[in-house]
Regions:
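M16 family metallopeptidases and their MPP-like homologs
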Residues: 1-26, 35-84, 98, 102, ...
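Active-site recognition of the HExxH zinc-binding catalytic motif
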Residues: 18-30, 239-240, 248
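Acidic/histidine-enriched alpha-helical segments
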Residues: 37, 41-46, 88-106, 171, ...
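A structural supersecondary motif
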Residues: 50, 219-221, 242-250
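A common structural junction motif
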Residues: 80-89, 182-190
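An aromatic/glycine/proline-enriched structural segment found at the starts
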Residues: 126-134, 159, 163-226, 244
Length: 250
C-alpha cells in the first residue's frame, strides 16, 4: 500500500520567513510521540515499511509504503499517524537541523546548476513567492525560531488542508477507515488560500553569472500554464518530442 498525505504547506506559505515550510516538514519525522528519529526509522524498517517527508514550493508531504498485511500495515499506520499528529518539535533537533540546513545551502551555492536555477526563478517570478528558495537562505534559516515552526504546523497541517492519496490492496471502505485513522485527530482548520497568480513577463531578460566551473549552464524559460489547462498534456508530450525529459549530449 502506498500512501501520500499532501498539505498545501509549501514554500509559498513562508510569509517572509524563507525556509520555514521546509524546516517544518523536515522536523516531522525527527521526533514524534516521544520517539526519536532513529526510533522512527528503526520501527519502519522492522515493519518492512518506508516512511518519508518532503516539501516544495506548493506543498509538503508525508509518504508511507507498507505491506498490506494488517500485521504490518496497522503498526505502520500508527507510526504515520504519530508523525503527522504528534511531532515533538524538540529544540535540540531544531537547532541541529537549522545548522545542517545552513551547511547544505552553502554547499548548494557552490553548484553552478543550483545558482542558475535560483537566478532563473528570481528573474522569472520577481516579487511572487515562487521566486524564493524553498530551503531558504543562510540568513533566513539563522533567523528562524522554533515557535515559528510550531505556529506554521498548527496553521497548515490541518484536515481541510490535506489531500490523501492511496494506491494498493484496499477497497473504498477500508481506505476511508485508513484516512480517519491517520488524520482523524487533526483539527479541521481551514484550507490554505489560493496562491496569487504569476505575473506575465513584460520583456526578455538575460542574466550572466561568472562561476569557476568547467561547464556552462544555461536556463531558458517563462511562466507556462496551469495543470488543469486542456493544452497541458499536448504541450507536455510535445516538449518530450523536442527533447525534454532528460535528453543529454550522449
Amino acid at each position: 500500500v502506498d500512501i501520500n498525505v499532501t498539505f498545501a504547506a509549501g514554500g509559498v506559505r513562508d510569509d517572509g520567513h524563507a525556509g520555514l515550510a521546509h524546516m517544518t516538514s523536515t522536523l516531522l519525522d525527527m521526533g514524534a510521540a516521544g520517539l526519536s528519529a532513529d526510533e522512527i526509522s528503526s520501527r519502519a524498517e522492522s515493519l518492512g515499511a518506508e516512511l518519508g517527508t518532503g516539501s516544495a514550493r506548493d506543498m509538503a508531504w508525508i509518504t508511507l509504503r507498507s505491506l498490506s498485511d494488517p500485521a504490518y500495515l496497522q503498526p505502520a499506520l500508527k507510526l504515520l499517524a504519530d508523525v503527522i499528529n504528534k511531532p515533538d518539535f524538540n529544540e535540540r533537533d531544531f537547532v541541529r537541523e537549522r545548522e545542517r540546513t545552513q551547511v547544505a545551502i552553502r554547499r548548494s551555492e557552490q553548484s553552478p546548476a543550483t545558482v542558475a536555477e535560483y537566478t532563473f526563478f528570481q528573474s522569472t517570478y520577481g516579487d511572487h513567492p515562487y521566486a524564493l528558495r524553498p530551503a531558504g537562505t543562510v540568513d533566513s534559516i539563522a533567523a528562524l525560531q522554533l515557535d515559528q515552526v510550531k505556529a506554521f504546523y498548527r496553521q497548515y497541517y490541518v484536515a481541510r488542508n490535506a489531500v490523501f492519496s492511496i494506491v494498493g490492496d484496499l477497497d473504498r471502505k477500508a481506505a476511508e477507515q485508513l484516512v480517519e485513522q491517520v488524520i482523524g485527530q487533526l483539527p479541521a482548520g481551514k484550507r490554505a488560500p489560493a496562491v496569487a497568480s504569476v505575473p506575465e513577463l513584460t520583456r526578455a531578460q538575460e542574466q550572466r553569472i561568472y562561476h569557476p566551473s568547467t561547464q556552462t549552464h544555461i536556463r531558458m524559460g517563462a511562466p507556462g500554464m496551469h495543470r488543469g489547462d486542456p493544452d497541458y498534456f499536448p504541450l507536455y508530450v510535445g516538449n518530450h518530442v523536442l527533447g525534454g525529459g532528460g535528453l543529454v549530449s550522449h
